[in-house]
From Swiss-Prot:
EC class (word): hydrolase
PANTHER family: ATP-DEPENDENT CLP PROTEASE PROTEOLYTIC SUBUNIT (PTHR10381), ATP-DEPENDENT CLP PROTEASE PROTEOLYTIC SUBUNIT, MITOCHONDRIAL (PTHR10381:SF11)
EC number: 3.4.21.92
Cytoplasm as UniProt keyword: yes
Entry protein name: ATP-dependent Clp protease proteolytic subunit
Organism of origin: Sphingopyxis alaskensis (strain DSM 13593 / LMG 18877 / RB2256)
Cellular compartment(s): Cytoplasm
Active site location: S103, H128
Length: 216
């Protein structure tokens, strides 16, 4: 099925020694080592993200990658495929929340390289425990319930690792939908910085983390 929105993706034209080359905007940004995690996290999308991460590692295993996240979450196993690839490859993967990072989206945001996890000023983050429906015979429902509990424990342990919070605090936050504004996500340990504009280049004024309040 053809995505009707694909025709709306801008094309960037560049001049080279061999003439003009055109890229869709996402392919051009991939050259700058920028990866987008947008929309629902599911298997097809996860495969594309994993492929991009592996490609960028093969291009330069020492150069950082930046992952921009605007996602309501999705399938746990698909998210874990992205998460495990982020940890597996050699380049550091910084994460940036634009819009929202909910459920599995917030998990991927927290899994970024420490010190390189960012939320923009009006971004929102939501954490909660994994959920799933169970149907069939009682024994099958019991098996599925045990699997969900096992996944919840694993994710809680990883949130403890990434946020520095105690397991008790994580379990309390994950028990129901917990919504966080950008500065609250920083306090929780999901991100390290909250920016309203891109950090300065060498020679510019120092970048300011807006979650630290106004400067004098």
């Amino acid at each position: 099925m053809i995505d009707p929105l694909a025709a709306l993706v801008p094309v960037v034209v560049e001049q080279t020694s061999r003439g003009e080359r055109s890229f869709d905007i996402f392919s051009r940004l991939l050259r700058e080592r920028i990866v987008f995690v947008t929309g629902e996290v599911e298997d097809n999308m996860a495969s594309l993200i994993v492929a991009q991460l592996l490609f960028l590692e093969s291009e330069n295993p020492k150069k950082d990658i930046y992952m921009y996240i605007n996602s309501p979450g999705g399938v746990v196993t698909a998210g874990m495929a992205i998460h495990d690839t982020m940890q597996y490859i050699r380049p550091r993967v910084g994460t940036v929340c634009i819009g929202q990072a909910a459920s599995m989206g917030s998990f991927l945001l927290a899994a970024g390289e420490p010190g390189m996890r960012v939320a923009l000023t009006n971004a929102r983050v939501m954490v909660h425990q994994p959920s799933g429906g169970a149907r069939g015979m009682a024994s099958d429902i019991e098996i599925q319930a045990k699997e969900i509990l096992r996944i919840r424990k694993r994710m809680n342990d990883l949130y403890v690792k990434y946020t520095g919070k105690s397991l008790k605090d994580i379990e309390k936050a994950m028990d129901r939908d917990t919504f966080l504004e950008a500065d609250e996500a920083k306090e929780f340990g999901i991100v390290d910085h909250v920016y309203d504009r891109r950090p300065a280049l060498p020679g510019d004024d120092a970048p300011r983390d807006v979650s630290e309040g106004p400067t004098p």
